[in-house]
């Protein structure tokens, strides 16, 4: 009888690390694997992962980048504690392979996995690698990246995205059947993007009513009241939502998406095959959102506007200058740069590297 293989996923902090990890976890679990997740009790993974019936191990570690003198002074002690906790988790789980998907907790756990001789596979979601993955890449058995040439000796797999996005109809099949005003989807994420919430309503108001697009604007629960007030003040009609349950349908219905440029957003836009105007978050570490967006914008597959250059007048002129055939071509180019088999490929590498 074949022994059941065990995957230990290390990921935490943000959805950009957790959601692709969940995609791979589900893929391997469907193949009969046992999956255990290592995270931080204070991260979103602590509440999200158990909803997927995945057991968790926890370590306590706040990161390698100093947040003040006290944090820097305590870093050696915090690292030592995290190494010890990681050692305990690895001995309890006895994984066949360890998959690091990013976040601070991957550093101590990944180092201990390597020290114990457990196969270590890394996946970097951003176009500029995080500090933990830069260090771990030197000891990992395999390094996978969402964007080309992010880390040395890595394989470009793309980002694992929601299964339904990878199997959407081709852009031509969607754009060619539409008539009337453009459909614009504005995505601010779970926290909302204040810059988009302020500028987009004003920009739409500057357009003649006959040229105004149909707008769906998602802003996060904390920003939704302010957003609705902004549209009311601008006397613009829009569907405003705190969150969107079915992102695949939202992408499928859109001619243009206006959004930030987090790694998963860029990957989802490409997988869906939809035109996008990216406004990178200006305070992202190493300005990685700009580099993420450039992966598509430099190929003519998206538009890129820096937040400091985002004005209502400029955005209004940009929207007025767009038409559906132009957007269809951008969507087609974006789809051509997607890696729809990313989940399958990452799972395949884990299977190849597994050792009982």
Curated annotation (Swiss-Prot):
Listed under GO biological process in this entry are:
carbohydrate metabolic process; cell division; cell wall organization; lipid glycosylation; peptidoglycan biosynthetic process; regulation of cell shape
The name under which this protein is listed is: UDP-N-acetylglucosamine--N-acetylmuramyl-(pentapeptide) pyrophosphoryl-undecaprenol N-acetylglucosamine transferase
> Which residues make up the binding site for UDP-N-acetyl-alpha-D-glucosamine?
14-16, 126, 162, 190, 244, 289
Q: Topology relative to the membrane, per the entry?
A: Peripheral membrane protein
Q: Name one GO molecular function term.
A: undecaprenyldiphospho-muramoylpentapeptide beta-N-acetylglucosaminyltransferase activity
Subcellular location as annotated: Cell inner membrane
Role of this protein: Cell wall formation. Catalyzes the transfer of a GlcNAc subunit on undecaprenyl-pyrophosphoryl-MurNAc-pentapeptide (lipid intermediate I) to form undecaprenyl-pyrophosphoryl-MurNAc-(pentapeptide)GlcNAc (lipid intermediate II).
Which top-rank group of organisms is this from? Bacteria
Catalyzed chemical reaction(s): di-trans,octa-cis-undecaprenyl diphospho-N-acetyl-alpha-D-muramoyl-L-alanyl-D-glutamyl-meso-2,6-diaminopimeloyl-D-alanyl-D-alanine + UDP-N-acetyl-alpha-D-glucosamine = di-trans,octa-cis-undecaprenyl diphospho-[N-acetyl-alpha-D-glucosaminyl-(1->4)]-N-acetyl-alpha-D-muramoyl-L-alanyl-D-glutamyl-meso-2,6-diaminopimeloyl-D-alanyl-D-alanine + UDP + H(+)
User: Lineage of this protein's species?
Assistant: Bacteria, Pseudomonadati, Pseudomonadota, Betaproteobacteria, Burkholderiales
Supply the PANTHER family for this chain: GLYCOSYLTRANSFERASE, UDP-N-ACETYLGLUCOSAMINE--N-ACETYLMURAMYL-(PENTAPEPTIDE) PYROPHOSPHORYL-UNDECAPRENOL N-ACETYLGLUCOSAMINE TRANSFERASE 1
Q: Which organism is it from?
A: Cupriavidus pinatubonensis (strain JMP 134 / LMG 1197) (Cupriavidus necator (strain JMP 134))
Which E.C. number(s) belong to this protein? 2.4.1.227
The record's InterPro entries line, in alphabetical order, gives: GlcNAc_MurG, Glyco_trans_28_C, GlycoTrans_28_N
Involved pathway(s): Cell wall biogenesis; peptidoglycan biosynthesis
Which UniProt keyword terms apply here?
Answer: Cell cycle, Cell division, Cell inner membrane, Cell membrane, Cell shape, Cell wall biogenesis/degradation, Glycosyltransferase, Membrane, Peptidoglycan synthesis, Transferase
Q: Which NCBIfam families match?
A: murG
**Cellular-component GO terms for this entry:** plasma membrane
One Pfam family in the UniProt entry: Glyco_transf_28
Family the entry assigns: Belongs to the glycosyltransferase 28 family. MurG subfamily.
